[in-house]
Swiss-Prot record:
Taxonomic path: Bacteria, Bacillati, Cyanobacteriota, Cyanophyceae, Synechococcales
Free-text function comment from the UniProt entry: This protein complexes cadmium, zinc and copper.
GO MF assignments: metal ion binding
Pfam families, sorted: Metallothio_Pro
Protein name from the UniProt record: Metallothionein
Annotated source species: Synechococcus sp
Keyword rRNA-binding among record annotations: no
Domain of life: Bacteria
Family from the record: Belongs to the metallothionein superfamily. Type 14 family.
Length: 53
C-alpha cells in the first residue's frame, strides 16, 4: 500500500504529511498544531528534523 504525502500548508515548512494523519484546517493539511495555528504566540518550528519553519 502506498501513501500519498502532501506538503504541509505552512509556507516555510519543509514537511510532507499523510493527509489521513495531518491536521486539517479548512481543507489544508498541516504537520503539527504550531503550523496549523500560523505559529501564533511566537512559536517557532514544528520540531521535525531539518525543518526551521
Amino acid at each position: 500500500t502506498s501513501t500519498t504525502l502532501v506538503k504541509c500548508a505552512c509556507e516555510p515548512c519543509l514537511c510532507n504529511v499523510d493527509p489521513s494523519k495531518a491536521i486539517d484546517r479548512n481543507g489544508l493539511y498541516y504537520c503539527c498544531e504550531a503550523c496549523a495555528d500560523g505559529h501564533t504566540g511566537g512559536s517557532k518550528g514544528c520540531g521535525h528534523t531539518g525543518c526551521n519553519c
